[in-house]
UniProtKB/Swiss-Prot annotation:
Keyword flag Coiled coil: no
Species assigned in the record: Arabidopsis thaliana
GO molecular function, one term: zinc ion binding
Family statement: Belongs to the PPR family. PCMP-H subfamily.
Locations listed in the record: Mitochondrion
Transit peptide: 1-19
Region named Type E(+) motif: 503-533
Listed name of the protein: Putative pentatricopeptide repeat-containing protein At3g13770, mitochondrial
Single GO BP term: RNA modification
GO CC field: mitochondrion
UniProt signal peptide: none
Region ranges (Type E motif): 427-502
Main location: mitochondrion
């Protein structure tokens, strides 16, 4: 707490003899004219004659200017003159301290209030929530309920924001019950906060039900449901919802567009992203950092790194998220040297400190860029405190991925053993994936079994272990793993690839027979296969994870979704037009080899984005250097 007594003494020891005005203006008029210091001097001269309107004007002026010391003088004057402020003025004091980030002082004002109203409680809850003190916000809400205070729509809208951060969905559902009980569920503020809470908790079905039941919708509620879909990776649903609401007359704001860009990034819809960018410019929306960061992320994930960098370079002020978006973009393209160069620039500028995400992007860039020793040095620097961020489990997982990607499986295994804490499923999963690529069966089997114990519901662990056994020809073990999956009702995420043509997404699954042009695609695939073999393509049968004969394996390889999408791209696009294909899982070795020879035979630039990174292929040469 500030030294009130010293300020009290200063308020009344200031000699007014040098203060001469021909006409003494009222304090409220001085404040409205921006003459705060004169108003404070007038307060000192009036002493105990100060009243409600003068204090109110002074507190509002101090609040507008975030003038902490001047506001403290006003508070000190109240105490010295034994003025007993009404609940309204005490609430203004609380809000003033909260806005000046003096939360302890704000809380003290609340605790000392003889009578509290809904505005007082809500102001304290709101400021705690806005500053990330979610537990404290919920504590104040609980005190409010115990003191028989009745929340209003603003209280509920504010406290719901804190539920997910601090206590998960359980408490949020209890508060939802109170909202229904007191008939606040139809209020637009409360409804928007409710659907935002459920969406952030992954309960998008409940969020959608709330959204559809709202008696009226504004841009906040519309943005909340779009953002909910985008945050959960339900990008198509987010895009459909945006188009629906736009057709219903919703006027998007910058937050809406930021959420839309997140969805377009996930779908890699570059043309749609460019259109959204044009809409933003045409509507002259505020170009806040959150929108610029979303644009950088969208262009990076859609493969247009040069434009992403241009946006980044032209930003008047960059946040940590801006730097991270650009670093992640370079990392996903395997451009490790560009990652390190940008990281050096960030540190040299000294305006924004690297955070945990920054270092994760840098380590990932080293991993994809074949710079293991550099990555290890940076990690050692993190441990030593050189970057102000200690390594977390994700950083350890990135080092395991880096060593495993380089084939240093034993070293990665030993690194895990030396971890200061128990390795998470993510860390072990990185090692299992590396064991599958480099056929390290013994370590992979041990890690895979352990992973299945840790997270028995994760289908990916079963699949990778099964694939490892299949690569080693251990078909009995493959069957055992698949039987285990059936017994536990664990289902694998189906692989799919997609390509955009004429503003439409065309999806393909393995051995797809559902596409409207399937007969044309399959006929073209047979023609392509002959030309590819003549050019030197040899199917990598080790990528078929079933115990069947070689002829059947070759047929299965030709049915992979990436190949079907490439074939459709060749049919649907004009000669020489680049073909861009996207896949939700990691591309297999055979499809990667196929795409390289495809680009050379048909003289097409091929861009493949899988779960991990981009592959830019020109004339048979891939940007990854066959290292991914």
């Amino acid at each position: 707490m500030f030294n009130l007594m010293r300020l009290i003494h200063r308020s009344f020891s200031s000699s007014p003899t040098n203060y001469v005005l021909q006409t003494i203006l009222p304090i409220s008029q001085l404040c409205s004219n921006g003459r705060l210091q004169e108003a404070l001097l007038e307060m000192a001269m009036l002493g105990p004659e100060m009243g409600f309107h003068g204090y109110d004007a002074l507190l509002n002026a101090c609040l507008d200017k975030r003038a902490l010391r001047d506001g403290q003088r006003v508070h000190a004057h109240m105490i010295k003159t034994r003025y007993l402020p009404a609940t309204y003025l005490r609430t203004r004091l609380l809000i003033f301290y909260g806005k000046c980030d003096c939360l302890e002082d704000a809380r003290k004002v609340l605790d000392e209030m003889p009578e509290k109203n809904v505005v007082s409680w809500t102001a304290m809850i709101s400021r705690y929530s806005q500053t990330g003190h979610s537990s404290e916000a919920l504590t104040v809400f609980a005190e409010m309920m115990r003191s028989d205070g009745k929340p209003n729509e603003f209280t509920f809208a504010t406290v719901l924001t804190s539920c997910i951060r601090a206590s998960g969905l359980g408490l949020g559902k209890q508060i939802h019950g109170l909202i229904v009980k007191w008939n606040y569920d139809s209020h637009i503020f409360v409804g928007s906060s409710l659907l935002d809470m459920y969406a952030k908790a992954g309960q998008i079905k409940e969020a959608r039900e709330i959204f559809e039941c709202l008696p009226e919708r504004d841009v906040v509620s519309c943005t909340a449901i779009i953002a909910g879909y985008a945050q959960l990776g339900l990008d198509e649903e987010a895009l459909e919802m945006f188009h629906r609401l736009h057709s219903e007359g919703m006027s998007p704001n910058y937050v809406t567009y930021a959420s839309l860009l997140t969805a377009l990034s996930g779908l890699a819809l570059l043309d749609h992203g460019k259109q959204a960018h044009c809409h933003v410019l045409r509507r002259e929306l505020p170009f806040y950092a959150v929108l610029q960061n979303s644009l950088i992320d969208m262009y990076s994930k859609c493969g247009n790194l040069s434009y992403a960098r241009r946006l980044f370079d032209n930003m008047p002020e960059r946040t940590a998220i801006s730097w991270n978006a650009m670093l992640v973009g370079y990392s996903k393209h395997g451009l490790g040297r560009e990652v390190l160069e940008l990281f050096r620039l960030m540190r040299d500028e000294k305006r924004v400190k690297p955070d945990a995400v920054t270092l994760l992007a840098v380590l990932s860039g080293c991993s994809h860029g074949r710079m293991e020793d550099t990555g290890l040095n940076i990690f050692d620097g993190m441990v030593a405190g050189e970057y102000g961020t200690k390594p977390g489990t994700e950083h350890y997982g990135c080092i395991v991925d880096m060593l495993g990607r380089a084939g240093r499986i034993d070293e990665a295994f030993e690194f895990i053993k030396r971890m200061p804490s128990k390795p998470t499923a993510g860390v072990l999963g990185s090692l299992l994936g590396a064991c599958r690529v480099h056929l390290s069966v013994d370590i992979g089997e041990s890690v895979g079994r352990r992973l299945i114990e840790i997270e028995p519901e994760n289908a990916g662990n079963y699949v990778i272990l099964s694939n490892l056994y299949a690569s080693a020809g251990r078909w009995a073990d493959v069957n055992n793993v698949r039987a285990m999956m059936m017994q536990k009702a664990v289902t694998k995420e189906p692989g799919r690839s997609w390509i955009q043509h004429e503003q439409t997404l065309h999806y393909f699954h393995a051995n797809d027979r559902t596409h409207p042009r399937r007969e044309e695609v399959l006929a073209k695939m047979k023609e392509i296969s002959i030309k590819m073999k003549q050019a030197g393509y040899v199917p990598d049968l080790s990528c078929v994870l079933y115990d069947v004969d070689e002829e059947q394996k070759e047929k299965m390889l030709l049915g992979h979704s990436e190949k079907l999408a490439l074939t459709f791209g060749l049919i649907a696009t004009g000669e020489g037009i680049p073909i861009r294909v996207f896949k939700n899982l990691r591309i297999c070795v055979d499809c990667h080899n196929f795409a390289k020879i495809f680009s050379k035979v048909f003289e097409r630039e091929v861009s493949l984005r899988d779960k991990n990174r981009f592959h830019q292929i020109v004339d048979g040469i891939c940007s990854c250097g066959d290292y991914w």
